[in-house]
Regions:
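Sec-dependent N-terminal signal peptides
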Residues: 4-13
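Aromatic-residue-lined binding/catalytic grooves and analogous aromatic/hydrophobic interfacial grooves
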Residues: 20-304
Length: 306
């Protein structure tokens, strides 16, 4: 026993004096292809909003999430009659009749109303968490059909930046996606190492209950979720997301009906703001003010090189 205690103490002392080993390389996940399924996309977030880019070459889908994006509404779910079965449930358990106790609990320990809707909670007052939407970027390589070389998709665990890079033809393309805690928005930084080689359009969508409009350099998606009570009219949570494109080195921006196109650029920064009326009744003003405050800063602040 004394020998074991001595060895244990010796190992502690040696461990305390071992120098820290630094590899000089950041911790990261990396892949040589875009994400084929949602689970393979890189998760990014600042605690309130989240982005998940899949790193697609021709079409890139970035899933958008916001923490308060819930359908449903207030409801009285208290069931004061449930306790009447508690004694019987306990008795059955003490007698080893677990299956009977479980069945009785399932039948009596339930809330009033429709509950979770048996997996259909989105359309009953119970509600469910909802996807805010998808930001879809369609890249135009100006007719280039050259193969892709050197594709690398990486999530840096030290700085929480997701990157994708590859070479097509004579041009190298780089993308960075991250979320800003200080400015409470998502950032997408796109570059090409040749003049006028960055061409793309972006749009937004979600499965239901949304409208998208373009306004200059901005794209706005907004809508309202079901409250689970009125099935004919949406009276639940309202939401909005606004995306603004900035071209630090020039280029052309053309708004369409529900998309925004960028042509002849070599660098673009997209700022993504999101809000619901759970916290902010003026959610349209909220998403606009987040972008306005961010634009006051040097655009270089929204790149990992700054």
């Amino acid at each position: 026993m004394k020998y074991n205690a001595f060895v244990f103490l010796f190992m502690i002392l040696i461990g305390c004096n071992m120098p820290e080993v630094k590899t000089g390389k950041p911790l990261s996940y990396h892949f040589d292809a875009p994400a084929g399924i949602w689970e393979a996309s890189f998760p990014l977030g600042n605690g309130r909003l989240g982005l998940m880019p899949d790193g697609g070459v021709d079409t890139e889908n970035i899933v958008l999430n916001e923490i308060s994006m819930w359908s449903g509404s207030k409801q009285d779910t208290d069931n004061p009659q449930a306790y009447h079965s508690l004694g019987t449930i306990r008795k059955l358990l003490f007698e080893g009749r677990n299956d009977e106790a479980q069945e009785l609990m399932y039948n009596t320990f339930v809330c009033k109303g429709e509950g979770s809707g048996q997996g259909q909670g989105a359309n009953v007052p119970y509600g469910s968490y909802q996807l805010l939407g998808n930001l879809v970027l369609n890249y135009d390589y100006q007719g280039t059909s050259d193969s892709i070389f050197g594709y690398r998709r990486e999530l840096n665990l030290d700085n929480a930046i997701a990157t994708a890079s590859f070479r097509r033809g004579k041009v190298t393309y780089n993308r960075e996606v991250f979320t800003s805690f200080a400015d409470d928005l998502g950032v997408i930084h796109l570059t090409a190492d040749a003049d006028r080689a960055l061409n793309f359009s972006f749009g937004m969508n979600r499965p239901e209950h949304y409208k998208v409009t373009a306004d200059g350099n901005d794209l706005l998606m907004q809508g309202q979720l079901p409250d689970g009570v009125d099935t004919l009219e949406m009276k639940g949570l309202r939401y909005a997301s606004r995306v603004r494109v900035i071209l630090p080195k020039g280029g052309n921006v053309t708004p369409g009906d529900s998309t925004v196109s960028v042509r002849n650029a070599s660098e673009a920064i997209l700022l993504v703001s999101m809000a619901t009326d759970y916290f902010d009744k003026d959610l349209e003003g909220k998403v606009s003010s987040l972008l306005a405050n961010a634009e006051k800063k040097d655009c270089l602040l929204y790149t990992s090189d700054a």
